[in-house]
């Protein structure tokens, strides 16, 4: 059994001494009675987690999942400049005109200035990372030997190792 010390004013100590039981027994019984009544009141939750805050959600209040896919930097500009009609942006997807991603990359990278693929900020030729969002400006591919290779090459011309893109092309 542990020892508990109580501090009380003189009137309370005198009232406890006037009782027939010992001070320790009186204080134990008082503490048990207090904990029993207050613990029972504390066990009842004030609010239930399952209690709805608002009423049942209507169709207009339900969550909506939105997926935005940007396949080129120019698509970012199209989405930004396209006005939304009725809460819905009907931006034309790039690539619908039959142009492949590789052709689009070749046409957009003709000048010294390029555009960040993540945020659309203009990048100069010496930028490795976008100064606006920190996204990688150049997506250069290197072989395990350290030589820079093109992403569409299946083998490294320096060491002859098979590249990751070569493995992907082989399995396709």
From Swiss-Prot:
Keywords: Cell cycle, Cell division, Cytoplasm, DNA-binding, Metal-binding, Transcription, Transcription regulation, Zinc, Zinc-finger
Disulphide bonds in the chain: none
Iron as UniProt keyword: no
A single cellular component GO annotation: cytoplasm
Subcellular location: Cytoplasm
Zinc-finger ranges (DZANK-type): 116-160
Residues covered by region (Disordered): 72-113
Broad class of where this protein is predominantly found: cytoplasm
S-adenosyl-L-methionine found in the keyword field: no
Pfam short name (any one): DZR
Protein's GO biological process: cell division
InterPro entries: DZR
An example Gene Ontology molecular-function term: zinc ion binding
Family the entry assigns: Belongs to the CdrL family.
Free-text function comment from the UniProt entry: Transcriptional regulator involved in the control of cell division. Is a specific and direct regulator of the cdrS-ftsZ2 operon. Acts by binding to the promoter region upstream of the operon. The CdrSL-FtsZ2 transcriptional network might coordinate cell division timing with cell growth.
Protein's UniProt name: Transcriptional regulator CdrL
The species this protein was found in: Halobacterium salinarum (strain ATCC 700922 / JCM 11081 / NRC-1)
Highest classification ranks of the organism: Archaea, Methanobacteriati, Methanobacteriota, Stenosarchaea group, Halobacteria
